[in-house]
């Protein structure tokens, strides 16, 4: 009960008991010294003198200077050893981060990256070559259900169209080498230059009312076949006529 009340109320005063001379004489309790009141400042008003007279026991003051330090030194050596200096590494030196927070740390990381990679220039955009550009953009309409996306028509600029027209004026057919040069100069692909010249030749033939080469070749082949058939028929007719003339008539044989 005493312990529970002491835990609940921290201001509990431990009771003081008088010297038990009677108990000592009877031998019930051994002589362990006189009890004395526990000095504790509780804030409550109490009597200046204890309720019971104290014995002549004088409490010796605790001298902190006379404490043996051998055990403490061993304890400090084992548990509170001073941290060893950290060896410096060969990498970039990092200083303690100021109170700036994450911004200062990020700026230091950027400076470290610039020191490690000095060749990389800041703010320089990568060079995009013509062959790296995407030529055809795949624009899929909402109603298109096909598996392969349709190609969008290439929109030639005014300068590109003018240069292609100049080249077509001098040469309607391009060699492979010339096509590569034009494509590299105008930032186009070889396929774009080839298709443009094919379409331009068809337009030129329509303007000059010239037949298509494919249609003309097929018509000439059919006409040659029909002419060969007519020639064979004429030869057969001539052979028939000549045979009729050589055969004698029955009137001439009777005479």
Curated annotation (Swiss-Prot):
Keywords: Developmental protein, DNA-binding, Homeobox, Nucleus, Transcription, Transcription regulation. The keyword DNA-binding applies. It comes from the Eukaryota. GO terms for biological process: anterior/posterior pattern specification; embryonic skeletal system morphogenesis; positive regulation of transcription by RNA polymerase II. SUPFAM superfamilies: Homeodomain-like (SSF46689). Gene3D superfamilies: Homeodomain-like. PROSITE patterns: ANTENNAPEDIA, HOMEOBOX_1, HOMEOBOX_2. A motif (Antp-type hexapeptide) lies at residues 128-133. Residues 28-102, 207-255 are annotated as: Disordered. Belongs to the Antp homeobox family. Deformed subfamily. One of its GO terms (molecular function) is DNA-binding transcription factor activity, RNA polymerase II-specific. Residues 34-49 have a biased composition (Basic and acidic residues). It is found in: Nucleus. Sequence-specific transcription factor which is part of a developmental regulatory system that provides cells with specific positional identities on the anterior-posterior axis. This is Homeobox protein Hox-A4a. It comes from Takifugu rubripes (Japanese pufferfish). PANTHER family: HOMEOBOX PROTEIN HOX-A4, HOMEOTIC PROTEIN DEFORMED. Residues 246-255 have a biased composition (Polar residues). Residues 149-208 bind DNA. Residues 217-245 have a biased composition (Low complexity). GO terms for cellular component: nucleoplasm.
């Amino acid at each position: 009960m005493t312990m529970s009340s002491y835990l609940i109320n921290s201001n509990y005063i431990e009771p003081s008991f008088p010297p038990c001379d009677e108990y000592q004489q009877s031998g019930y309790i051994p002589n362990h010294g006189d009890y004395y009141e526990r000095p504790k400042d509780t804030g409550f008003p109490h009597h200046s003198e204890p309720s019971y007279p104290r014995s002549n026991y004088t409490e010796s003051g605790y001298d902190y200077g006379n404490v043996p330090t051998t055990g403490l030194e061993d304890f400090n050596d084992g548990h509170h050893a001073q941290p060893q200096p950290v060896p410096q590494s060969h990498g970039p030196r990092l200083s303690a981060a100021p109170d700036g927070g994450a911004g200062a740390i990020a700026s230091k990381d950027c400076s470290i990256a610039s020191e490690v990679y000095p060749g990389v220039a800041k703010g320089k955009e990568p060079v995009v070559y013509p062959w790296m550009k995407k030529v055809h953009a795949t624009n899929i309409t909402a109603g298109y259900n096909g598996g392969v996306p349709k190609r969008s028509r290439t929109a030639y600029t005014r300068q590109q169209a003018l240069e292609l027209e100049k080249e077509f004026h001098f040469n309607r057919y391009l060699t492979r080498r010339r096509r590569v040069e034009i494509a590299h100069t105008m930032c186009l692909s070889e396929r774009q230059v080839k298709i443009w010249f094919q379409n331009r030749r068809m337009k030129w033939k329509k303007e000059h009312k010239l037949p298509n080469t494919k249609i003309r070749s097929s018509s000439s082949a059919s006409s040659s076949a029909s002419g060969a058939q007519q020639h064979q028929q004429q030869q057969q007719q001539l052979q028939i006529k000549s045979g009729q003339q050589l055969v004698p008539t029955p009137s001439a044989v009777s005479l």
